[in-house]
């Protein structure tokens, strides 16, 4: 299984290791990441589509060689677990029956057998957390945990909880945390590092010399959409009603003057009302009802402005179903005359929002130009998935299907893991050429041929924005088109996502420069001793390849020095260098390093491990 073909040379170098099957392409930035990951527990940040998985294979191979303990790779969904197992069985040079899935789909009593038999376990985090907590498994039997999509390791997420358990119960375990986007704030990045016991940061940037030969062109286009007068007329009574309710809450003193109503402002008003109720202020109870109605109306208006009429009606239909279970607040909201009149008028008008037809035209044009194209459409909402799937199915040559999560939502059932995997295979093979997906499709989709990604709306998260764009331009040029409805939440979200992404990369650079994570191990430790690189029948060591490629590519793609860069360099010269911390002191809970497998005086291995 060869990765992207090398663009500069006809000869493709490949990695040679006793526990790897031939075919892993050697890339300098991946070898650099490998060296960091084998030196100490590492957070690897690499753009989507540049082969984080290949680094994971190489790290697993070396741990198979060095130790007899188990290796766990954690992925957020059962679908990704199955995908990781399939790829690892193709690439790892061990008995495929020793690479097993460990998920909640297997009963607990059978998981015990899987744990005992498996050498490499592909797992979901919840099952590892639960079984480790219940002492069904011991994390002390593990030498390495790879956290794929590691940005989840914050707060009470199962990723973070597994990290806590691993650090508390395994003194010598290594961690490799892999992600394209660890978080937009320093706090989020550092929390991931802390929860997973990270000693070291490895960051690969798309525009750096080592990645340039493998970068394919990605076109990012934003399509601004004006709301038609017919839609504005339909929603005007709803907006007027909301404005009156907001004024009432402001007169009661629970909300200040606002230019644009946001979810945060509504939440702050709700908190103010809660404090009033705790003081036994009788006004609080009436205000609480009004604020709840304002929140529901705010959500409805956002849907109508950014998604369309059908999405708004689906929202109200779902609320009506919830109201039948006895939710008095929902029933009160739906019984308002303004809502009743809106539902009657909207059902008679059909879809008024232009986004759906814009998507229809773009899909039709792309498929008519190239029937072999693959198009991936992302949206936040399942009802939009349903509407788009029905709309696109009427276009000649379009073979469209939906891709949603496993949980059920209202009347709509989720997809099973088997259905998800089958759908991806159909998309990959061309049986389906248009896939309409919710956020479940953002992480780790193994779809190398999506030439066009349509984002029905922008997303505020830098993480999710990066992942959506990463679904295209993996092996050939691709296009990302984002639909933004003017004068709506879309515009704010679009600007916020760009700002957060810039901030994320700046924070990574600051953290690395300040030495808050990075540690440089002793040069005597030859972590790549078992890796060779074969080029046109000849072999060199991985270290030699890394040095030669780095020199070659830095000459081929020199860094352009700008005035801003010069000024930054001057400013940095006056900064006090960060205090260096020893590996022994910095490692959490006496965590071992690969340096302990080598003689301190000679730098040679102390003992040789044999394969199982």
Residues covered by each model-derived region:
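SF2 helicase catalytic motif II
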Residues: 125-176, 183-188
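Conserved RecA-like helicase motor core of SF1/SF2 enzymes
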Residues: 143, 405-409, 433, 439-467, ...
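Helicase motor interdomain insertion/brace
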Residues: 158, 162, 189, 203-212, ...
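Conserved pre-motif I regulatory segment
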Residues: 2-45
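Conserved helicase ATPase core of P-loop NTP-dependent helicases/translocases
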Residues: 106-115, 374-378, 384-390, 397-438
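Walker A/P-loop NTP-binding motif
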Residues: 31-42, 50-67, 87-90, 163-168
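Conserved segment of the helicase C-terminal RecA-like domain
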Residues: 471-498
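Conserved Walker A/P-loop ATP-binding site and its immediately adjacent core
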Residues: 48, 53-58, 68-90, 129, ...
